Amino acid sequence: MKKSTLALVVMGITASASVQAAEVYNKNGNKLDLYGKVKAMHYMTDYDSKDGDQSYIRLGFKGETQINDELTGYGRWEAEFAGNKAESDSNQQKTRLAFAGSKLKNLGSFDYGRNLGALYDVEAWTDMFPEFGGDSSAQTDNFMTKRASGLATYRNTDFFGVVDGLDLTLQYQGKNQDRDVKKQNGDGFGTSVTYDFGGSDFAVSGAYTNSDRTNQQNLQTRGTGDKAEAWATGLKYDANDIYIATFYSETRNMTPISGGFANKTQNFEAVVQYQFDFGLRPSLGYVLSKGKDIEGVGNEDLVNYIDVGATYYFNKNMSAFVDYKINQLDSDNKLGINNDDIVAVGMVYQF
């Protein structure tokens, strides 16, 4: 698709919303909330495998039970269902989140299951584009960078009730070897710290993860080493209808590429958004991931694009969106990564 045509599309449409869950049950210390989203979406691009319908449905619940005055149990489940597949197709559903745990007042919470990795505590701040974004160092089932399985997670807010706005995460991930080699991981741990200066409009965060790699991963052509390691740091401002966030991260022997893994990546993301009173929320962002010291390649951009989008909120449940991914990768990049632009347009119903 010509970039001039894409630009005209971008000028014409608008983008997505977030709302609260619907309370299904709340009685005798037991509470259950149901939430969901229908995203009717179409991609326009010269990249054949992405062009066309990309619609999906997400459904989840969050429940909690009051065990006593100090202890609360909780659980969460979320799944996604493809809306662009034939009814006869397999693999139309995937579990995004599934964990359960307990919270003991100021001492914090502990849970286990499929959850968000510690590094995503930083990366989530820029994962705010209407459709794209959040894909430099954060990837699903890639150690503890995003959603992953086998996570034991301890979270503490306001640091045991002593320091307002200081949040701590400690995480352990058990090994997962019964899957595609790029989705495997050995035992690992992660941690993150976030501080908003006692409830101010500014916040800073940092995270670190370190994991064993599997034997199969070390047999790949690219990216060897016993450990997969990552760190990230971020800044956020959220006030006066303005949202600004940025982060920088580095990974070692972790980020999947053609033929294996990148020995090192340097990653940067930024987003700026403004919420108008009449419902429009324009968005401007940038995402960059540079692969370093790749066998047979050297240094090469893995992700590099400017993102221009907008969201229009009809009300708390309904929105429309457009998101224009302006790809900055070279057409002759040595890893054969697609460099076509993509425009995503659609509507979202959420509850």
From Swiss-Prot:
Signal peptide positions (record): 1-21
Keywords for this protein: Cell outer membrane, Ion transport, Membrane, Porin, Signal, Stress response, Transmembrane, Transmembrane beta strand, Transport
SUPFAM superfamilies: Porins
Main location: membrane
Function: Uptake of inorganic phosphate, phosphorylated compounds, and some other negatively charged solutes.
GO molecular function: porin activity
Similarity comment: Belongs to the Gram-negative porin family.
Name of the molecule in the record: Outer membrane porin PhoE
GO biological process per UniProt: monoatomic ion transmembrane transport
